[in-house]
C-alpha cells in the first residue's frame, strides 16, 4: 500500500493506472475509520482493480470551528487498518495541498436545492464544502466508481445529483448503514460519547423504528408522529435536533403517490450530534 500526500505524485500514479487500463474505485473519507468505512472498502474492492482511499478532514464542510479542531485525526491507525484490507493507495494530503490559496476565494461547487434543505438548513455551507471536495477528488483521481455510505442519506443524494449535472462518468455506489449490535449506526462522531451516553445512543434507532412502524401501518399524521418522536428522544436524554419524514426518492414532502419514505433523524447526545436514517416502503 502506498501513501500519497502530494498532487504531483498522485497524478503520476493516476496516469499510470489509466495507461494500464485499470478500473479504479475511490472511497472518500475524513479518517478515524471504523467498520462502516471498511464495508465501503470491501465494496470498492469487489467492483474495481485498484482501490484508493482518501483521508482528508475537509475544513470547508465544517460550519463550526470548534468541531473542526476536535474532529478525531488517527492517520497512523487508519493506514494500518487499510493496509490489512489490502487497499492499494491512501491519498492523505495536507490542507495546503488541497487549498493552496486558503478557503477565501476558493472556487466551489454548489448543488442547488439539496445543499440548503433539511440538514443544510441547520448547517449552512456544509454541503457546499462536501460537493466541492468530492468534485475536486473526482477531478484528481478520475475514478470509475466511488463508494459512499447511506448513513449520510442527503449527502449521497447530493453527490448523485452533482455527478449527473456535471457529466461525471462515475458510478456512485451507496453502501448500507453498518450498525453495532444494539442498533447504533457506526460513525466517527461516536467517539465523542461517554460510556454512559453510549448506552443511551441506540435510543435514536429505536425511535426511528417506532416511526417506521406507524408509517407502515398507514399513519400519515406526520406532525404528530414527529412530535411524539422528539418527546421520546428528549425523555431518553437526547436533545432532539431535527426529525423529517420525506419521499425517499426526491427528499421532498410525502405525497399520496410516494412509494418510499425516508426517516431522517438528528439529535444531540452530549457533545455528539448523531444522525441516522431509515427507509420505509409505503402501502399504496
From Swiss-Prot:
Q: Where does ATP bind?
A: 30-37, 149-152, 178, 186-189
Q: Which residues cross the membrane?
A: none
Its Gene Ontology cellular component terms are: cytosol
- Which key words tag this protein in UniProt? ATP-binding, Cytoplasm, Ligase, Nucleotide-binding, Pantothenate biosynthesis
Q: Give the catalytic activity.
A: (R)-pantoate + beta-alanine + ATP = (R)-pantothenate + AMP + diphosphate + H(+)
Pathways involved:
Cofactor biosynthesis; (R)-pantothenate biosynthesis; (R)-pantothenate from (R)-pantoate and beta-alanine: step 1/1
Q: Where is the active site?
A: 37 (proton donor)
Q: Which SUPFAM superfamilies match?
A: Nucleotidylyl transferase (SSF52374)
Q: Which CDD domains match?
A: PanC
| Cellular localisation | Cytoplasm
Which residues of the sequence carry a binding annotation for (R)-pantoate?
61, 155
Q: Name one GO molecular function term.
A: pantoate-beta-alanine ligase activity
Instruction: Give the chief site where it resides.
Output: cytoplasm
Q: Where does beta-alanine bind?
A: 61
The domain of life is Bacteria
Q: Which E.C. number(s) belong to this protein?
A: 6.3.2.1
Q: Family per UniProt?
A: Belongs to the pantothenate synthetase family.
- Assembly and oligomerization: Homodimer.
The function of this protein is: Catalyzes the condensation of pantoate with beta-alanine in an ATP-dependent reaction via a pantoyl-adenylate intermediate.
Also noted in the record is: The reaction proceeds by a bi uni uni bi ping pong mechanism.
Q: What is this protein called?
A: Pantothenate synthetase
* Organism expressing this protein natively: Salmonella typhi
